[in-house]
């Protein structure tokens, strides 16, 4: 038994928790969708939040030197990534940072590329900013997503792509892109003058011996056209505190990005976010190691159960706590699949089509919950699909 509690289910009802919103009106429904965790938070984060709450004033705040040092230390010790503090830019979230990058480095009507299926806000951010969305389909091979580099280069050139948004580790497929893959991506971007935004928010959640490589550690030359994004919020389940960061080593790109933050009045961050992030990186390493063991156990459980009891094809993730499920072996429409999950199994998974057209007859399962709850979710799915 570990030091930390990953078996208790915190009561999230009545707290305006987005993940559990539908359960508040239908108590039979179990949520296994949006990417946050149903675990008790790291005790030191809770203490930091309580200390903040005990203050008599909740005014404007700034990023302390202690916070900056903790972020630098985390990146250096976990990933061998060393950078000057001037390269660090705090922002309220990774998705707002992506939109800021789109607004800063592209013009309306210009092309932005993403690898689909992928986290839905990528496409949304491109479209709502009136940029031209280019989707480069990932290819499934041996149970993992791969990039078709011939098609990628063709897309970059023919569509005159200005910005490439990469998801590493990949959501929803859980692919941890290796150094060789990132090297090829960087070479293509360098060759064709494409800026790259690397969303690395799941970087800490690599599993089964896989290791994350930050894009800015692959080749020093790549730093000239890269904006790397990350946060403690996904790893430590503190998304509600609203804090993330960009590492932009090219001063020209960084100044342009910061100027746009100021223009959008996005340069001020929650004091709660600063404190929670600092506590997470200072005290959270052991908690994280236990958490990853829990995820590996949960993922193996899902793979084994669905493999034995259903025709659902499971893409076993190399990282993240998200599993991409393929229901195409059943004679279903996308609408019927959603109806079966929501109304018969009484579970909420993310709809595959939200990740792109490649997500047809797929769904994304979140395993970041106590094992007992995960077992109930999965048994409901098994019962529903064993009949078909």
Regions found by a protein language model. Give the residues of each.
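Conserved N-terminal alpha-helix of the aminotransferase class I/II PLP-enzyme fold
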Residues: 59-92
């Amino acid at each position: 038994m570990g030091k930390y509690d990953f078996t208790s289910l915190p009561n999230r009802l009545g707290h305006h928790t987005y993940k559990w919103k539908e359960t508040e009106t239908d108590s039979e429904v179990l949520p296994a969708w949006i990417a946050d965790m149903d675990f008790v938070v790291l005790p030191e984060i809770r203490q930091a939040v309580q200390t903040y709450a005990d203050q008599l004033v909740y005014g404007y705040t700034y990023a302390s030197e202690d916070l900056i040092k903790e972020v630098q230390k985390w990146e250096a010790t976990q990933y061998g990534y060393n950078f000057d503090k001037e390269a660090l830019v705090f922002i309220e979230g990774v998705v707002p940072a992506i939109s800021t990058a789109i607004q800063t480095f592209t013009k309306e009507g210009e092309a932005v590329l993403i690898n689909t299926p992928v986290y839905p806000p990528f496409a949304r951010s491109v479209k709502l900013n009136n940029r031209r969305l280019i989707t480069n389909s990932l290819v499934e091979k041996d149970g993992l997503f791969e990039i078709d580099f011939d098609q990628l280069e063709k897309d970059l050139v023919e569509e005159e792509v200005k910005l490439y948004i990469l998801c590493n580790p990949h959501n929803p497929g859980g692919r941890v892109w290796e150094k060789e893959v990132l090297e090829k991506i960087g070479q293509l971007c360098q060759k064709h003058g494409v800026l790259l935004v690397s969303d690395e928010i799941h970087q800490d959640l690599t599993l089964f011996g896989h290791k994350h490589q930050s894009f800015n550690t692959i080749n020093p030359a790549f730093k000239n056209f890269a904006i790397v994004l990350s946060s403690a919020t996904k790893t430590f389940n503190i998304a509600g505190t609203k804090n993330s960061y960009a590492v932009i080593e090219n001063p020209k790109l960084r100044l342009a990005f910061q100027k746009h933050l100021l223009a959008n009045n996005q340069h001020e961050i929650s004091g709660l976010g600063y404190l929670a992030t600092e506590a997470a990186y200072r005290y959270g390493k052991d908690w994280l190691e236990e958490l990853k063991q829990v995820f590996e156990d949960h993922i193996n459980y899902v793979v084994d159960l669905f493999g034995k009891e259903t025709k659902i094809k499971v893409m076993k993730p190399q990282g993240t706590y998200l599993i991409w499920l393929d229901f195409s072996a059943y004679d279903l429409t996308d609408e019927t699949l959603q109806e079966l999950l929501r109304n018969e199994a009484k579970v909420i998974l993310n709809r595959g089509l939200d990740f792109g057209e490649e997500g047809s007859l797929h769904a994304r399962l979140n395993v970041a919950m106590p094992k007992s709850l995960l077992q109930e979710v999965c048994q409901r799915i098994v019962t529903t699909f064993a009949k078909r």
